[in-house]
Every structure is written in C-alpha cells, then in structure tokens.
Amino acid sequence: MEKKTKINAEEGKQELSITREFDLPVELLFKAYVEADIVEEWMGTKVLKLESKKHGSYQFETTDPQGNKYRFSGVIHEFNPNRNITRTFEFENMHLGVQLEFLEFEELTNGTSQLNMRVIYESVAHRDQQLKMPFAQGLNMAHNRLQDILNKLK
C-alpha cells in the first residue's frame, strides 16, 4: 500500500497536524531533517544554513522556474536526536507570519517509523491561506522523495 501524508485541519483552529509513516528506521528519518545534503535532495531546495542543535537556526532558498527566489528560515528551540525537533518556520516572501512546528519521530518497528508534526499558526486566517496553496500535494510529493532517497541509504 502506498504511504500518504495525512493532514488534519480542524475548522476554526489555528493549527494543523501532519502524519506520515515511512519504511525507514527512525534514525534515518531523523537524519533527513538534520543533514543539509539530504534536506536539499528531498526538499528540492538550497540549504543556506542548517545548525541542527538546540538554539541553532536554518535558512533555505528555493528558486521557481521563472527565477524568483523564495527563502524560509527559523530557529530550533528543542533538539533531541531521533526523538523530536521544535522550531519556528517563516516563509520570508509570504505574509503567513511565523509558525511554531513540533516534529516528533516515532519508531513503529525496527524498520518503520512515523513523523508526527503539529504546526501552530499566528491565526486561523494564516493557516487557511497556506491550505489554499498546493501545500498538501507538495508535502506528500516531498515525503515520497524522502522515502525514495533514503531507501538508497538503508
């Protein structure tokens, strides 16, 4: 059965939850979020900065087919290897405000794991604005790439 990223957005709330199961050990899934070369490959973005540690920060840049550059960045507030990352996220060219993201990495079996994310937005309007974009489709495609890329590292 094909794995699919699930997004739950309750009406009137300024948060959403994201879950995805992977056929990967939890250590490898965690590595996909903290090693710059792997992040670049599955996210399709350039990593300008990635300090994978408590009080670290990150900045990524994506260029669209027309040459427009989009940057997003944040600060890492909590970092526990193979368990969780708490960070902020800001899309610098958009007016979606700063998000707070809680990423939890859960071992399901010896070779499978699950990513559980909770994202809190400044307002319901900001969350709903993001959901109007091809957010869910893009995230599912990125998670499919993550699985494919990391299959080669197993």
Predicted regions and their residues:
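A short, structured loop/turn motif at beta-sheet edges
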Residues: 26, 77-83, 104-114
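Short, highly charged C-terminal tails/helix-capping segments
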Residues: 151-154
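Hydrophobic ligand-binding cavity/cleft-lining segments
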Residues: 1-46
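Intrinsic-disorder/low-complexity, polar/charged segments enriched in Ser/Thr/Lys/Arg/Asp/Glu/Gln
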Residues: 13-19, 57, 71, 84, ...
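Hydrophobic/aromatic beta-strand elements that line small-molecule binding cavities or substrate pockets
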Residues: 20, 48, 72-78, 89, ...
